[in-house]
C-alpha cells in the first residue's frame, strides 16, 4: 500500500486531536473544535464511518476499546462514545477544559488531566472516577507506559508518578524549557520520556536519578525556519514514537513532521504535508500509516491527512 490521502480538507474548525485505533489498523477518530468527533476507515478510498456531535469543543481523545472513545471537552466534561450505537455517557467532569487523556496499564483505567489543576482516574466499567488529585498546577499533557505516568504542567515542572501510588509524584522535574510544555511522550526503549514546548525545542529525559542516567539527558532545537535573517520559532505540538522502530516523530506549527533517531541525536527525514499548524499526529498499530491533523486561527484550517509509510521509512539509519 502506497498512498497519501486527505480525509478532511478546509474544515471551518480545526482538529484538536487524531488517534488511530489500538487494535484495528485502518480506523481512526478525530476530535474537532466544533464539538464533532469523526470516525474514519482508511483504504485506497477512505470512508467516513460516522460523525458525532457533542456539546463542547473536543480537546482530547483515547480509545477504550476498538468501538468506544473516551472524550475530554473544553467545558470539562468526560464522556464515553459508542462508535456503533452513537450513544454517549457522561462519566464526570473537571472544573475546566480536559487537556489530555492517557490510557493506564491498569485494566480499563484512563487518566484525564485538566487546566483546573487536577487529574482524575476513570474506570470505564464503573463509569465514574476511582481516584484523583488536585496538584496545584495546570496540566497541559500526559503520557503513561508500564507503571510510569508523566504530567507536563504549568510553572515549568514535569511530575512523574508510579501509577500504583498516585497520591504523590516520586519525581518533580524542572522543565528544560523557558516556556510552556506542549506535549510529553513515554518511550519503551529507555526509562524516560520526551517533552516539547512552544519555543521550538524538544527534550529527552531519563527517569533514573543516577548521575550516569542523568548525563544522557539532552535538549535540541527543531521546527524553526530562517526568513530574512530572522529565526522563526514554532511550537512543537505533538510527539509520538514509531511503534516498530521507536524513532521519534515531532509535529510543529511550521506544518512539518520531523523524524529523529534520539539514540544518535540525528534527524532522519521530514514530511511537509501542510503549510499551517499541525496540532496532532498518530501512527497506526503496525506503523504503516501516519495520520496528521491541522488546526490554526485562519478560516478553513482544519485538515486530516494520512500517509502510508514504507516499512523502513522511520527506521534508524544503518551504521556504516
From Swiss-Prot:
PROSITE patterns: WD_REPEATS_1, WD_REPEATS_2, WD_REPEATS_REGION. Gene3D superfamilies: YVTN repeat-like/Quinoprotein amine dehydrogenase. It comes from the Eukaryota. Phosphorylated by bub1. Disruption phenotype: Sensitive to thiabendazole (TBZ). Keywords: Cell cycle, Cell division, Centromere, Chromosome, Kinetochore, Mitosis, Nucleus, Phosphoprotein, Repeat, WD repeat. Coiled coil: none annotated. Transmembrane segments: none annotated. Its main location: nucleus. The keyword Repeat applies. Part of the BUB1-BUB3 complex, composed of bub1 and bub3. interacts with mad3. Interacts with spc7 (phosphorylated on MELT motifs); to recruit the BUB1-BUB3 complex to kinetochores. Involved in mitotic spindle assembly checkpoint signaling, a process that delays anaphase until chromosomes are bioriented on the spindle, and in the repair of incorrect mitotic kinetochore-spindle microtubule attachments. Localizes bub1 to kinetochores and suppresses activation of bub1 away from the kinetochore. PANTHER family: MRNA EXPORT FACTOR AND BUB3. This is Spindle assembly checkpoint protein bub3. It comes from Schizosaccharomyces pombe (strain 972 / ATCC 24843). The gene is bub3.
Amino acid at each position: 500500500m502506497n498512498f497519501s490521502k486527505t480525509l478532511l480538507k478546509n474544515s471551518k474548525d480545526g482538529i484538536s486531536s487524531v488517534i488511530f485505533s489500538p487494535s484495528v489498523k485502518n480506523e481512526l477518530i478525530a476530535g474537532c473544535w466544533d464539538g464533532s468527533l469523526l470516525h474514519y476507515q482508511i483504504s485506497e478510498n477512505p470512508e467516513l464511518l460516522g460523525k458525532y456531535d457533542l456539546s463542547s469543543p473536543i480537546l482530547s481523545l483515547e480509545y477504550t476499546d476498538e468501538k468506544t472513545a473516551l472524550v475530554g471537552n473544553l467545558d470539562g466534561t468526560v464522556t464515553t462514545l459508542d462508535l456503533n450505537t452513537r450513544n454517549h455517557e457522561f462519566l464526570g467532569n473537571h472544573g475546566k477544559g480536559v487537556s489530555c487523556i492517557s490510557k493506564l496499564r491498569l485494566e480499563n483505567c484512563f487518566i484525564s488531566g485538566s487546566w483546573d489543576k487536577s487529574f482524575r482516574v476513570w474506570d470505564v466499567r464503573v463509569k465514574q472516577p476511582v481516584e484523583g488529585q488536585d496538584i496545584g498546577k495546570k496540566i497541559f499533557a500526559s503520557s503513561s507506559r508500564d507503571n510510569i505516568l508523566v504530567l507536563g504542567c504549568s510553572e515549568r515542572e514535569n511530575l512523574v508518578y508510579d501509577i500504583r501510588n498516585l497520591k504523590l509524584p516520586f519525581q518533580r522535574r524542572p522543565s528544560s524549557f523557558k516556556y510552556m510544555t506542549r506535549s510529553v511522550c513515554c518511550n519503551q526503549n529507555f526509562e524516560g520520556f520526551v517533552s516539547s514546548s512552544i519555543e521550538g525545542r524538544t527534550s529527552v529525559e531519563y527517569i533514573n536519578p543516577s548521575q550516569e542516567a542523568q548525563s544522557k539527558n539532552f535538549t535540541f532545537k527543531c521546527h524553526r525556519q530562517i526568513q530574512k535573517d530572522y529565526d522563526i520559532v514554532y511550537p512543537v505540538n505533538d510527539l509520538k514514537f514509531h511503534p516498530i522502530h521507536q524513532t521519534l516523530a515531532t509535529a510543529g506549527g511550521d506544518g512539518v513532521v520531523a523524524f529523529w533517531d534520539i539514540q544518535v541525536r540525528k534527524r532522519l527525514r521530514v514530511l511537509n504535508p501542510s503549510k499551517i499548524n499541525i496540532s496532532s499526529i498518530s501512527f497506526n498499530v503496525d506503523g504503516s500509516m501516519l495520520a496528521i491533523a491541522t488546526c490554526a486561527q485562519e478560516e478553513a484550517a482544519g485538515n486530516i491527512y494520512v500517509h502510508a509509510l514504507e516499512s523502513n521509512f522511520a527506521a534508524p539509519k544503518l551504521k556504516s
